[in-house]
Structure formats: structure tokens, C-alpha cells
Swiss-Prot record:
PANTHER family, sorted: OLIGORIBONUCLEASE, MITOCHONDRIAL
Role played: 3'-to-5' exoribonuclease specific for small oligoribonucleotides.
Active site (record annotation): Y129
Subcellular compartments: Cytoplasm
InterPro entries: Exonuclease_RNaseT/DNA_pol3, Oligoribonuclease, RNaseH-like_sf, RNaseH_sf
Annotated protein name in UniProt: Oligoribonuclease
Pfam annotation, one family: RNase_T
EC number: 3.1.15.-
Domain Exonuclease: 8-171
Length: 181
């Protein structure tokens, strides 16, 4: 497949917490869709190795959710570094989207961009500076048309790939039910 500037890159990170100054990335996943939100390809889903000491610093919420999902065990067993994750992800993305063409797409994507700026700058620079943030639409629909919100429910697994898939499905829902296009 040739790279297409109209394709969209969807990304999700799982982190040890919400503060990039003290927390780190522990999982990354990407998907590429066409402009109509049809999934074209799944990128590598990578658990990034972190030390036991780093993982022990996670708060209770993160310990619980990342423990239940099996992510903590995958991170401990992983041999992948942040550099490996950057390299593999960019290699995948370059097949589908030229550098600088796609906005960063996902839910609460500003948070992911903060961590990419801190830990994975080369990957962050692959994206256009704009964002397609599904959570922005969700917040507006919640306020302007709350009854519409009943039509879509997320599982909230806090696993990067599943979260991206849900973000795409959520935007497809808003496109049909809110934008009617």
C-alpha cells in the first residue's frame, strides 16, 4: 500500500500515571484508518519494559487496572525499550501515512501527546500538530444532547489496542448520530 496523506493515525498509550514528569509509557498501539474511518492496518502493540521499581511507584488505580489486564506482567516480561517502540511504530506508519500528514487521533489525545513529547519525541514529530480528539466531541454531546450518549457504551479496558478500536467506533457513532454524515 502506498502512503496516503488522507489516512488517519490512531494512537493510544498506557502509562504508569498521568504526569509525564514522573510517570512513563508502558504500552503503545497504533491503527491506521482511511478518511472514512475504515481500519486499514494495525500497528505493533508494544509493552515497554520498565523496572520493578518504576512499576511499584504506580498509584492504586494503575496497579489495579494494569494488573487486572495483565499489562504489568507483559511490561515486566518485555524486552522492548522506548527506542524500539519508536522505531517499530514509525516503520509501520510510514507504509500508510507520510510524515507530518495525519493529525494525532484518539481519546484524550492531548495526554498522549504530552508523554510522546517527553519520551518519544521522534514519534510525536511524525504527526501533524493538529489532533482529532474524540473526547472533545463526547464532552460536547454530553452537554448538548445527553440522550444521544445512551447509544454508545465503552468497555474501558485500558489496553491500548482495544482503547483505539473503541475510539474509532465512538467517532463512527458520533458521525452517524450527531453529525449525520
Amino acid at each position: 500500500m502506498t502512503a496516503d496523506a488522507n489516512n488517519l493515525i490512531w494512537i493510544d498509550l498506557e502509562m504508569t500515571g498521568l504526569e509525564p514528569e514522573v510517570d512513563v509509557v508502558i504500552e503503545i498501539a497504533t491503527l491506521v484508518t482511511d478518511s472514512e474511518l475504515n481500519i486499514l492496518a494495525q500497528g505493533p502493540v508494544i509493552a515497554i519494559h520498565q523496572s520493578d521499581e518504576t512499576l511499584a511507584k504506580m498509584d492504586d488505580w494503575n496497579q489495579k487496572h494494569h494488573g487486572q489486564s495483565g499489562l504489568i506482567d507483559r511490561v515486566k516480561a518485555s524486552q522492548f525499550t522506548e527506542a524500539d517502540a519508536i522505531e517499530q511504530t514509525i516503520k509501520f506508519l510510514a507504509q500508510y501515512v507520510p510524515k507530518g500528514a495525519s493529525p494525532m487521533c484518539g481519546n484524550s489525545i492531548g495526554q498522549d501527546r504530552r508523554f510522546l513529547n517527553k519520551y518519544m519525541l521522534e514519534l510525536e514529530e511524525y504527526f501533524h500538530y493538529r489532533n482529532v480528539d474524540v473526547s472533545t466531541i463526547k464532552e460536547l454531546v454530553k452537554r448538548w444532547s445527553p440522550e444521544t450518549m445512551k447509544g454508545f457504551t465503552k468497555q474501558g479496558t485500558h489496553q491500548a489496542l482495544q482503547d483505539i478500536q473503541e475510539s474509532i467506533a465512538e467517532l463512527q457513532f458520533y458521525r452517524k448520530e450527531v453529525f449525520k454524515i
